[in-house]
């Protein structure tokens, strides 16, 4: 085997591994957002990755041809036609995390243009991604639900304690009148 053939074999193996890794990400994600990033600096891309990571999402940049192969057999296969030019794919298990960060990043960076996305088998245009981004996150929803559950118990405890408190104030007022007389 010549040196060129060895290099090609190694390159082919690396591409196959990249496709398998991407396929695993696409199979387990609930939402994918596709954006074009032509002209972004390395620092801006690092900031995007950091913001996505903080939100529980991730960003993948790969060759479009490899990404299209990796999409096969996944729920988000519909984003394949959106992969044109320098594209980035943001994914998350929380259906709101990746869209929310992508929309905020696009507002601050005009060279980051959202093309569309997919939530499961549902294809999203730019407006669909914006709509998802405007929804509360799973953690926010959980907090609201806990608040709704806890609020009645708190009010019930306040109501149960209120008559005893009123009685104590009446007795105190009566005792104060007796001392003044």
Swiss-Prot record:
Q: What is a single molecular function from GO for this protein? A: large ribosomal subunit rRNA binding
Keywords of the record: Ribonucleoprotein, Ribosomal protein, RNA-binding, rRNA-binding
Any Pfam family = Ribosomal_L10
Q: Which GO terms describe its biological process?
A: translation
Q: Does the UniProt entry include the keyword Phosphoprotein?
A: no
Sorted alphabetically, which CDD domains does this protein's record hold? Ribosomal_L10
One GO cellular component term noted in the UniProt record for this chain: cytosolic large ribosomal subunit
* Keyword Acetylation applies: no
InterPro entries reported in the protein's UniProt record: Ribosomal_uL10 (IPR001790), Ribosomal_uL10-like_sf (IPR043141), Ribosomal_uL10_bac (IPR022973), Ribosomal_uL10_bac_type (IPR047865)
Briefly state the protein's biological role. Answer: Forms part of the ribosomal stalk, playing a central role in the interaction of the ribosome with GTP-bound translation factors.
Assembly, in brief, is: Part of the ribosomal stalk of the 50S ribosomal subunit. The N-terminus interacts with L11 and the large rRNA to form the base of the stalk. The C-terminus forms an elongated spine to which L12 dimers bind in a sequential fashion forming a multimeric L10(L12)X complex.
Instruction: Return the similarity comment.
Output: Belongs to the universal ribosomal protein uL10 family.
Name of this chain's protein: Large ribosomal subunit protein uL10
